[in-house]
């Protein structure tokens, strides 16, 4: 017909109720095979477990089960060999596989969908995929944490400026700074592990939404598929995409941490800072400026964070107004997750490589740590400890000392004892013991502090947990 409508239903899986097939536009908007074919392995794995359970419970014959399993394994081989022909008319990965199975083994293929709906089938496939992706992310985060632990250990004594408002605040060590990222990515990994535990329930057997009257064994399929147990409410099971939202939330938080790190890499690799040199492996040049070495990998990690954040908001918006149980809107869940997973994998891998390969310029860090009056807090603390001043008074006295040093264009340690005593008479020569950045760093021995001894304790604690 002129409008692209088939006279017969183009989809024999559900077309019995229809007098004519869908229009070409309907087929285009309805089809998901372009992206959900990524779930082929999970779909086949779930179908094998389902068929095995059906045979075990006497719902289908052992002979049909063996034909189904053999046919599904044949399809798996075809897909992985690149010889399988996907059809948009068959909408999705489930129907593409089932149609091919019917071609391979005949009527026995029609028994596979007994006690099953595409609603619980896709919930299973997608949940399996997200679970596997989370496990992969866990391993990648472990590698990134290991890279930071190595850097922290190498630089437990490397003095650098610590910043607030991107202005020099107090001296810290680069090892301590690296350990801050270990904590961040450690929390990300903990969220990943919690998410795996959260989704460790099998949806298969919930059917369309109400369960099934067949004597199935959902615990059997759950165990076969590596889940802790089956889900407990069939309506919630087919309408739940919390596991996808949780994955995107974790990805978004992790990407935010990666983006903060990327920003520091971009800044620190500039000639103006010069704290680090990126390896050639994670840099690019300019087509016109021969001297340029651009931190493109870090910049792209930073950019991908916006993409991942957008995916989270997109799926939250899809889900926010859906009545129970299943709606076709939920087909829009997968592309957001697939894209974010790919972006996150790339970002973590790139950042792990950058951290392992970067050159730390200790001399530049040390020089910067000594500028900006970074030991002013140490002066104030000395006045509290040694001169007995209340901290607020000590803060004021120190501010006067900074103003004088600023006026003279020198560091605090370059002020004479006479100049300091003119600001406060109780200052003694002992003040100069705390005004070096090394002394400042060494004094920060509180739990979690920047003193090299504390940094090494932090590293040891994480080594035992990574």
From Swiss-Prot:
Keywords: Amino-acid biosynthesis, Arginine biosynthesis, Cytoplasm, Lyase. InterPro entries: Arg_succ_lyase_C, Argininosuccinate_lyase, Fumarase/histidase_N, Fumarate_lyase_CS, Fumarate_lyase_fam, Fumarate_lyase_N, L-Aspartase-like. Pathway: Amino-acid biosynthesis; L-arginine biosynthesis; L-arginine from L-ornithine and carbamoyl phosphate: step 3/3. The keyword Lyase applies. GO terms for molecular function: argininosuccinate lyase activity. One of its GO terms (biological process) is arginine biosynthetic process via ornithine. Its EC number is 4.3.2.1. GO terms for cellular component: cytosol. It is found in: Cytoplasm. It catalyses: 2-(N(omega)-L-arginino)succinate = fumarate + L-arginine. Gene3D superfamilies: Fumarase/aspartase (C-terminal domain), Fumarase/aspartase (Central domain), Fumarase/aspartase (N-terminal domain). Coiled coil: none annotated. PROSITE patterns: FUMARATE_LYASES (PS00163). NCBIfam families: argH (TIGR00838). Belongs to the lyase 1 family. Argininosuccinate lyase subfamily. This is Argininosuccinate lyase 1. It comes from Agrobacterium fabrum (strain C58 / ATCC 33970) (Agrobacterium tumefaciens (strain C58)). The gene is argH1.
């Amino acid at each position: 017909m002129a409008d692209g409508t088939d006279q017969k239903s183009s989809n024999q899986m559900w077309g019995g109720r229809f007098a004519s097939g869908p229009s070409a536009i309907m087929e285009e908007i309805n089809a998901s095979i372009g992206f959900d074919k990524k779930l082929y392995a999970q779909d086949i794995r779930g179908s094998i477990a389902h068929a095995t359970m059906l045979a075990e419970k006497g719902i289908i014959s052992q002979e049909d089960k063996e034909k189904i399993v053999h046919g599904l394994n044949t399809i798996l081989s075809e897909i992985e060999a690149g010889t399988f022909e996907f059809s948009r008319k068959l909408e999705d990965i489930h129907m593409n596989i089932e149609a091919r199975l019917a071609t391979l083994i005949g009527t026995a293929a029609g028994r596979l969908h007994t006690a099953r709906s595409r609603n619980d089938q896709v919930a299973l496939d997608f949940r399996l995929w997200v679970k596997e992706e989370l496990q992969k992310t866990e391993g990648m985060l472990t590698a990134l944490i290991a890279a930071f632990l190595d850097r922290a250990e190498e630089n437990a004594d490397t003095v650098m400026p610590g910043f607030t408002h991107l202005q020099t605040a107090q001296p810290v060590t680069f090892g301590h700074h690296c350990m801050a990222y270990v904590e961040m990515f450690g929390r990300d990994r903990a969220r990943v592990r919690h998410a795996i535990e959260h989704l460790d329930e099998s949806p298969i057997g919930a059917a369309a939404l109400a369960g099934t009257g067949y004597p199935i064994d959902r615990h059997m399929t759950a165990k076969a598929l590596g889940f802790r147990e089956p889900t407990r409410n069939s309506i919630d099971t087919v309408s739940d995409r919390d596991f996808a939202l949780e994955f995107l939330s974790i990805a978004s938080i992790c990407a935010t941490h990666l983006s903060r790190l990327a920003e520091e890499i971009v800044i620190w690799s500039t000639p103006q800072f010069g704290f680090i040199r990126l390896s050639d492996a994670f840099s690019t040049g300019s087509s016109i400026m021969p001297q340029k070495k651009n931190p493109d990998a870090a910049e792209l990690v930073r950019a991908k964070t916006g993409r991942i954040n957008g995916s989270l908001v997109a799926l939250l918006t899809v889900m926010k107004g859906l009545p129970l149980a299943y709606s076709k809107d939920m087909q829009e869940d997968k592309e957001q997750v697939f894209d974010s997973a790919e972006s996150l994998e790339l970002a973590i891998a790139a950042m792990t490589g950058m951290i392992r390969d970067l050159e730390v310029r200790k001399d530049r860090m040390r020089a910067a740590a000594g500028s900006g009056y970074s030991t002013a807090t140490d002066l104030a603390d000395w006045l509290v400890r040694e001169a007995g001043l209340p901290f607020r008074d000590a803060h004021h006295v120190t501010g006067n000392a900074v103003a004088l040093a600023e006026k003279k264009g020198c560091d605090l340690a370059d002020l004479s004892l006479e100049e300091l005593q003119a600001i406060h008479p109780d200052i003694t020569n002992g003040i100069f013991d705390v005004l070096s950045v090394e002394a400042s760093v060494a004094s920060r021995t509180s739990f979690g502090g920047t003193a090299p001894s504390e940094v090494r304790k932090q590293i040891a604690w994480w080594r035992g947990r990574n």
